[in-house]
Amino acid sequence: MNDNKYSDFKFLHFNKTLKAIGEKKIVSPIHIRIKPTNVCNHDCWYCAYHSSDVQLGDQMTYRDVIPYEKLDEIANDIVKMGVAAVTFSGGGEPLLYKKLPEIIEKLHKGGVKVATLTNG
């Protein structure tokens, strides 16, 4: 098997998950992507999130932030479920989320791999 990190067959490394799916069992996700905030420190003219056509949903605003208590609860659930990895990204800059280091530390201590997509 190719050891390329970007292989289309990377999912084959998760044999237990594949077996459980084949047995029609409910399994936790391997990877979760979280957008902790829409707040951004740039004002890029080409950004889709600045478009008047962007559909954020009825309950969302341009500068939304997931409340810390909710994100902490989500992090606890991710660890309990045995999720392998989390990526923080968003319509904003995830590193502007003030308590992100605490959440990342909790996930790391729980054995979850963490990545962040940033504009910096």
Protein language model annotation of sequence segments:
Residues N2-G120:
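Conserved alpha-helical substructure of the radical SAM core
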